[in-house]
Design a protein with these regions (language model features):
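Structured nucleic-acid-interacting core domains from mobile-element enzymes and related host factors
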Residues: 8-33, 101-102
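Short, conserved, surface-exposed binding loops centered on an aromatic residue
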Residues: 19-20, 38-41, 98-100
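RNase H-like nuclease module associated with reverse transcription
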Residues: 24-26, 44, 62-192
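Conserved active-site beta-strand-loop modules that form the wall/rim of enzyme catalytic pockets
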Residues: 15-17, 26-28, 47-49, 55-56, ...
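Short helix-interrupting loop/turn segments at helix-coil junctions
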Residues: 11-18, 37, 57, 144-150
Length: 192
């Protein structure tokens, strides 16, 4: 059944493409996690989307490699992975000779206020070593100015469809926010 849905999606979106704009050249990240929802599942799902000038340049949806014992642990694992990708993207842009320097921190939008609060905390009081390591990584990325974390409502989180099932309208809305448009609308002089 899932394969039929994927094939149907591909069939109906073959005339769509990502439309990159020239300005403003700002990189933003969005991350989300879906803690174990089904009784047969043991691992949570993470997802992130990074946009450049409002158009997706990097995205990923994946099962987490360790078992999260709570929603906040699941969100923090997702935030750690998004932080790794943000650091890679920022380093990539810094290596481009004509890219404006210095680069601003990559803003990662997260819909978990608890994870945002934990990220800014100097102490991790949990007992899980795998979460402590991720906390230290995120805290280091924050303190070194590579990333900053900001709250976004779930309904405005561009990465939301990578971790949860959405209605057709939800998928269409999220696709537009990632810069996916019909090919006929790409020649308005502002896209490349």
């Amino acid at each position: 059944m899932a394969m039929k849905r994927v094939l149907g999606y591909l069939k109906h979106t073959q005339d769509f493409s990502l439309h990159y704009k020239k300005y403003p050249v700002v990189i933003k990240g969005y991350n989300d996690a879906n803690w174990i929802t089904g009784s047969n599942e043991v691992k949570s799902t993470s997802g992130y989307v990074f946009t450049l000038s409002g158009v997706a340049v990097s995205w990923r949806s994946f099962k987490q490699t360790c078992i999260a014992r709570s929603t906040i642990e699941s969100e923090f694992i997702a935030l750690d992975k998004a932080g790794e990708e943000a650091e890679w993207l920022r380093n990539f842009l810094e290596d481009i000779p004509y890219w404006p320097k210095p680069l601003a921190p990559v803003c990662i939008h997260c819909d978990s206020q608890a994870a945002i609060g934990r990220a800014g905390s100097m102490m991790y009081n949990g007992k899980s070593c795998h979460i402590r390591r991720r906390h230290n990584t995120v805290r280091e990325l924050l303190s070194s100015g590579i990333i900053m974390i900001d709250y976004v409502k779930s309904k405005d989180n561009v990465s939301y469809p990578l971790t949860k099932g959405l209605s057709r309208e939800g998928v269409e809305k999220s696709s537009k926010r990632m810069g996916l448009r019909p090919r006929t609308s790409c020649h308005n002089g502002n896209s490349t």
